[in-house]
């Protein structure tokens, strides 16, 4: 029997996970990356239980467990440096890792499974019948096309699947610093002060990940390229050691957050995955995690089914949880970044009270404890 063939647009985390899943199930897979080289932009990333199970499914977990940090405690503090919440989802597994290490691990397992990766290959459109159009005008056909080409997805746009792309009016700078004895081990810290949020995240041997979030109208806060620590030192004096170690001319920069809502995740023999289907703010550490879990579900539902029948089934099963994660992430961002400055103590009291509810914790971070029912 001839193997079914997939063309995947985008060699980011979602695209490579999908490629590894399909190749592991006997598909021939080609991934198109418009850049001349494979690279992952960013600093560190959270891998919650759902992502760890996806990594296990494709044989990449050991690579991440070796490269990353096993986090036992997460702490949230307020503008008075008071502890509001700790051990979010107590007992759940959490690893933090360099995005570059995660990307390399996914690439390694995908290539080992037989995936072909084409760099400098720019896809400009897709057709519902399983066709993609390259920049040079050539057309390629497949049993399945997967658009994993990000917020500005050309696959999604070419099929008229965009419902909305919403600028959330805030964003984040992501930075890496060399780890010292001042930095936490096995514990992450996030502190809120006004509309600014700072995170200190151990994520690999020798490295600590720093994230600095603020609304778009915080002109001093968004100027992070080059990085000047003065404004952030004034807001977060307890983290002076970390802030002063952020490289002035490093790769970190402030980038906007967007929510993407698609009319559908599929059209004919074309599927959308990751940011192309459901970009969200990273406030719950779930944007990549749900994409990776959705990739595993996609591979499962395609087994023994026609592509045109499998894709709607996949969306019906997985979209509700992804939409919920996106919504809670947006709410988290509003509370942390857009809350009225005169009501910060009210915010602290509210968050502290809500954090004591285990039921609410699981409701807000529903994605972390969910793994596709189709993949059971």
Segments from the language model and where they lie:
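Active-site substrate-recognition segment that forms the wall
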Residues: 187-219, 236
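Histidine-centered metal-chelating micro-motifs
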Residues: 153, 172-174, 196-199, 277-278
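C-terminal helical "tail/cap" subdomain of flavin- and related membrane-associated enzymes
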Residues: 1-4, 66, 81-82, 284-285, ...
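Conserved N-terminal glycine-rich FAD pyrophosphate-binding loop of Rossmann-like flavoproteins
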Residues: 36-54
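Conserved N-terminal helical subregion
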Residues: 2-6, 23, 48-159, 163-180, ...
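Short beta-strand element of Class I
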Residues: 29
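Flavin-binding catalytic cores
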Residues: 221-254, 315-316, 320
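Conserved mid-domain beta->alpha element of the FAD-binding
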Residues: 8-24, 32-35, 147, 251-335
């Amino acid at each position: 029997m001839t193997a079914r063939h997939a063309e995947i647009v985008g060699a980011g985390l979602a695209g490579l996970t999908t490629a590894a899943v399909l190749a592991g199930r006997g598909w021939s897979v080609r991934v198109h990356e418009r850049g001349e080289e494979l690279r992952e932009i960013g600093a560190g990333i959270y891998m919650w239980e759902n992502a760890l199970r996806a990594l296990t499914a494709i044989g990449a977990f050991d690579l991440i467990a070796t490269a990353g940090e096993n986090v036992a405690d997460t702490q949230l503090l307020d503008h008075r440096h008071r502890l509001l919440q700790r051990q979010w989802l107590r007992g759940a597994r959490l690893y933090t890792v360099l995005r570059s290490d995660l990307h390399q691990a996914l690439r390694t397992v995908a290539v080992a499974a037989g995936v072909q990766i084409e760099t400098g290959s720019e896809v400009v459109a897709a057709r519902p019948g399983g066709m993609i159009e390259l920049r040079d005008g050539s057309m390629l056909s497949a049993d399945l096309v997967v658009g994993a080409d990000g917020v500005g997805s050309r696959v999604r746009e070419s099929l008229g699947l965009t419902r909305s792309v919403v600028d959330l009016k805030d964003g984040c700078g992501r930075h890496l610093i060399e780890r010292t004895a001042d930095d936490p081990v096995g514990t992450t810290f996030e502190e809120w002060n006004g509309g600014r949020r700072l995170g200190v995240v151990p994520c690999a041997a020798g490295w600590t990940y720093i994230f600095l979030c603020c609304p778009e109208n915080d002109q001093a806060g968004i100027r992070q390229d080059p990085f000047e620590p003065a404004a952030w030192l004034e807001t977060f004096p307890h983290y002076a050691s970390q802030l002063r170690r952020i490289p002035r001319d490093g790769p970190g920069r402030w980038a906007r957050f967007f929510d993407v809502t698609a009319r559908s995740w599929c059209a004919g023999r074309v599927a959308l995955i990751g940011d192309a289907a459901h970009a969200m703010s990273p406030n719950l550490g779930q944007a990549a995690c749900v994409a990776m879990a959705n990739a595993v579900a996609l591979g499962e539902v395609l087994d023994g089914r026609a592509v045109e029948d499998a894709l709607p089934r996949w969306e019906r099963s997985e979209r509700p949880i992804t939409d919920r994660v996106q919504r809670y992430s947006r709410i988290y961002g509003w509370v942390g970044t857009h809350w009225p400055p005169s009501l910060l103590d009210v915010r602290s009291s509210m968050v502290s009270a809500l954090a004591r509810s285990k039921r609410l914790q699981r409701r807000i971070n529903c994605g972390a404890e969910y793994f596709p029912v189709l993949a059971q």
